[in-house]
């Protein structure tokens, strides 16, 4: 049984989602958003770090996954988003958690089946996959999507590793 913390970083709103993996089943544990104040960026980064550190203490995850960001609306936004990701990653590494990163396309593909899915489609599929009574808030749904993507990716790697040394007809497969 593994507990995965997924994070959708943002300098104003950082979503988080926690799932527990029992066998091949993913079970919802918790989710929400860290909403930073309108203070200067260094204080917002500290709020992200402190908020995720508390979530890590509360849920005791085994693994940490975060969305990798490739582009933003402008250079300033991209820099702030990168710094928010850094604050989140430092919170994870301070707790000795392994960190995995996934692109938005990978996450959407794992959750919806297409890398071009809309936010509402991700919310709907997260609700269905985790058997939630209602669709989670967009940032929390994205974070849960990161956790689900990490689960599926790690399961695929485990399956591949298990077959890596299987000999079939005199060749490795």
Swiss-Prot record:
Top EC class for this record: hydrolase
InterPro entries reported in the protein's UniProt record: RNaseH-like_sf, RNaseH_sf, X-over_junc_endoDNase_Mg_BS, X-over_junc_endoDNase_RuvC
Lineage: Bacteria, Pseudomonadati, Pseudomonadota, Gammaproteobacteria, Alteromonadales
Cofactor or coenzyme needed: Mg(2+)
Keyword DNA repair in record: yes
Species in which this protein is naturally found: Shewanella pealeana (strain ATCC 700345 / ANG-SQ1)
Disulfide bonding pattern of the chain: none
Full protein name: Crossover junction endodeoxyribonuclease RuvC
Function per UniProt: The RuvA-RuvB-RuvC complex processes Holliday junction (HJ) DNA during genetic recombination and DNA repair. Endonuclease that resolves HJ intermediates. Cleaves cruciform DNA by making single-stranded nicks across the HJ at symmetrical positions within the homologous arms, yielding a 5'-phosphate and a 3'-hydroxyl group; requires a central core of homology in the junction. The consensus cleavage sequence is 5'-(A/T)TT(C/G)-3'. Cleavage occurs on the 3'-side of the TT dinucleotide at the point of strand exchange.
Subunit structure: Homodimer which binds Holliday junction (HJ) DNA. The HJ becomes 2-fold symmetrical on binding to RuvC with unstacked arms; it has a different conformation from HJ DNA in complex with RuvA. In the full resolvosome a probable DNA-RuvA(4)-RuvB(12)-RuvC(2) complex forms which resolves the HJ.
Signal peptide (from-to): none
Domain of life of the source: Bacteria
UniProt entry tagged with the keyword Nucleotide-binding: no
GO biological-process terms attached to the record: DNA recombination; DNA repair
Pfam families with a match to the protein in the record: RuvC
Cofactor binding remark: Binds 2 Mg(2+) ion per subunit.
Enzyme Commission number, as recorded: 3.1.21.10
Keywords, sorted A to Z: Cytoplasm, DNA damage, DNA recombination, DNA repair, DNA-binding, Endonuclease, Hydrolase, Magnesium, Metal-binding, Nuclease
Active-site residues from the entry: 8, 67, 139
Family of this protein: Belongs to the RuvC family.
